[in-house]
From Swiss-Prot:
Record bears the keyword Acyltransferase: yes
Catalytic center residues: S89, H199
Organism the protein comes from: Staphylococcus aureus (strain Mu50 / ATCC 700699)
Protein's gene: fabD
Molecular function in Gene Ontology: [acyl-carrier-protein] S-malonyltransferase activity
Official protein name in the record: Malonyl CoA-acyl carrier protein transacylase
One of the GO BP terms on file: fatty acid biosynthetic process
Domain of life: Bacteria
Xref: InterPro entries: Ac_transferase_dom_sf, Acyl_transferase_dom, Acyl_Trfase/lysoPLipase, Mal-CoA-ACP_Trans/PKS_FabD, Malonyl_CoA-ACP_transAc, Malonyl_CoA-ACP_transAc_FabD, Malonyl_transacylase_ACP-bd
Record field: catalytic activity: holo-[ACP] + malonyl-CoA = malonyl-[ACP] + CoA
Length: 308
């Protein structure tokens, strides 16, 4: 029996003009976009559509923008009937909306706060991330341990696919790894355009503030399992999910294990909902046999709704 998982991208997928094609062209998507504009304390639609002030790349804006785009696409799709859902990092919040763990309005407030706390904890230039290509997890972990000291750390942060491990930590060590990468055996090390050391233990400084903030919202048991980044398991219990979303701040994203867990459950079709095809590209490198569908635009939505 064929099973389907809907999956959602995280930071890095944003681009100017995102979701503009949906606005006023699809009632369900427009409702989500309008709701985001009413709920948030900044002009999210201007930031997404034109970004005249150049603020889309700031994490406190990127996070609600991506959640809003994925949720608008999701609302516009008919006859999805997924068996599971999974998101990469920030994308996990879109999964929570999809599985009705959080309302969209609550989720968009939470990711706005998540971004603000991250930005406040690490002013630009303190922490960073980089993608290490061509090495396995054990080797990357070993390199990180050899570079880290008592006052500066670098750690594996996203275990994306074979030969692609993202590391996170103090910018000085990230820069050192970028410089030394090839001599350490990597094909290359690419710095990422992010403003903080996400998914590293450095993020524990915001754990308490974030945990107390998300406790004020209503969390519900998931309508279908959410495969969580921190443990690569499908969860439906609201308390387990909420606890894992706090741990997610400072824990590695277990994307390879999560994808393999889904395939073990019988999933043979992954539908990526949101800008870009980053996750589809990663999954191809994990398993070439699964079916991949990308829903990024109004045209993609129409194609799905007409054919399914």
């Amino acid at each position: 029996m064929s099973k389907t998982a809907i999956i959602f991208p995280g930071q890095g997928a944003q681009k100017v003009g995102m979701a503009q094609d949906l606005f006023n062209n699809n009632d369900q998507a427009t409702e989500i976009l309008t709701s985001a504009a009413k709920t948030l304390d900044f002009d999210i639609l201007e930031t997404m559509f034109t970004d005249e002030e150049g603020k889309l790349g700031e994490t406190e804006n990127t996070q609600p923008a991506l959640l809003t785009h994925s949720s608008a696409l999701l609302a516009a799709l008919k006859n999805l009937n997924p068996d599971f859902t999974m998101g990469h990092s920030l994308g996990e919040y879109s999964s929570l909306v999809a599985a009705d763990v959080l309302s969209f309005e609550d989720a968009v407030k939470i990711v706005r706060k998540r971004g603000q706390l991250m930005a406040q904890a690490f002013p630009t230039g303190v922490g960073s991330m980089a993608a290490v290509l061509g090495l396995d997890f054990d080797k990357v972990d070993e390199i990180c341990k050899s570079l880290s000291s008592d006052d500066k750390i670098i750690e594996p942060a996203n275990i994306n696919c074979p030969g692609q491990i993202v590391v996170s930590g103090h910018k000085a060590l990230i820069d050192e790894l970028v410089e030394k990468g090839k001599s350490l055996g990597a094909k290359r090390v690419m710095p990422l355009a992010v403003s903080g050391p996400f998914h590293s233990s450095l993020m524990k400084v915001i754990e308490e503030d974030f945990s107390s903030y998300i406790n004020q919202f209503e969390w519900r048991d998931a309508k279908f399992p959410v495969v969580q980044n921190v443990n690569a398991q499908g969860e439906t219990d609201k308390e387990v999910i909420k606890s894992n979303m706090v741990k997610q701040l400072y824990s590695p994203v277990q994307f390879i294990n999560s994808t393999e867990w889904l395939i073990d459950q019988g999933v043979d079709h992954f539908i990526e909902i949101g800008p870009g095809k980053v996750l589809s590209g990663l999954i191809k490198k994990i398993n070439r046999d699964v079916k991949l569908t990308s829903i990024q635009t109004l045209e993609d939505v129409k194609g799905w709704n007409e054919n399914d």
